[in-house]
């Protein structure tokens, strides 16, 4: 009789893990939870094949977060990239209890319980993903620009047009509406633009102007890099922020194609460091040399098509200080006084 009961329990457990559409687990927030949350081993063992590298966490408020799932050398799986944003927005504290409901595809519904009262946190139902980004106001333009800063890479939601390659133009802040890339690119005229770039004190002169133009050319899907010595001379390595990588599923070693006008460069993306950051070394030096990149230049990277494999990035180059260029390479974007 006992053997039959044991057999029944094994069968029931197998049925649960293999056929139930929704599965649950709970996790107590222990010290060190801010940047990484371990998934219970039994859950990860049974659901490993079902778990993609990027999952969606759905807050009680309905707000969703894209979070990366990583596996260490001991086969322990954990929420990693993007988890810190979920923690911050929900003001999670040590000893809080979370209940995860897995729908069998890539989404978890999350309930948040207070560790002291053992009741749900009411505030978790009123979370909005809009209050934690660093905001700066451009005094001369009259609009508020939201920026997400990551190391030496900036992304901006405010948009101004990308100027046609190889053109030398004058640019005025605030003269043109914040509309899309393609429409504004058609409407721009080199004759009626007036340069008044005066934003962050990254460097003096043309470098500051190049950065200002690049920030207003970027789309919400892109990122920009202010070229430092490590990018173009010493290490010759391009670091890409892990949040952008997670959003675009650039989380494993893979090929990347960069394009300026009709010319393409094949490169390799690699993961490095404990934080899970990634970047490009193989192929980047060739890109730097062919495009005569220097310190102070600014590059805007825009995904050409998220469905294309390998990932294609269109690159727009804004020249910094007007120094003599070698190799007879014309600037892609220049700034005239």
Curated annotation (Swiss-Prot):
UniProt entry tagged with the keyword DNA-binding: yes
What's the domain of life for this entry?
Eukaryota
The reply to whether DNA-binding figures as a keyword in the UniProt entry is yes
InterPro entries noted in UniProt = B3_DNA-bd (IPR003340), DNA-bd_pseudobarrel_sf (IPR015300), REM16-like (IPR044837)
Primary localisation category: nucleus
Q: Which UniProt keywords apply?
A: DNA-binding, Nucleus, Repeat, Transcription, Transcription regulation
Q: Name one GO cellular component term.
A: nucleus
Against SUPFAM superfamilies, the record matches this protein to: DNA-binding pseudobarrel domain
Q: Which GO terms describe its molecular function?
A: DNA binding
What does the record list as coiled-coil region(s)?
Answer: none
Residue ranges flagged as DNA-binding region: 22-116, 223-321
Pfam families recorded: B3
Q: Where in the cell is it found?
A: Nucleus
PANTHER family, alphabetized: B3 DOMAIN-CONTAINING PROTEIN OS11G0197600-RELATED, B3 DOMAIN-CONTAINING PROTEIN REM16
What's the protein name? B3 domain-containing protein REM16
Name the gene for this chain: REM16
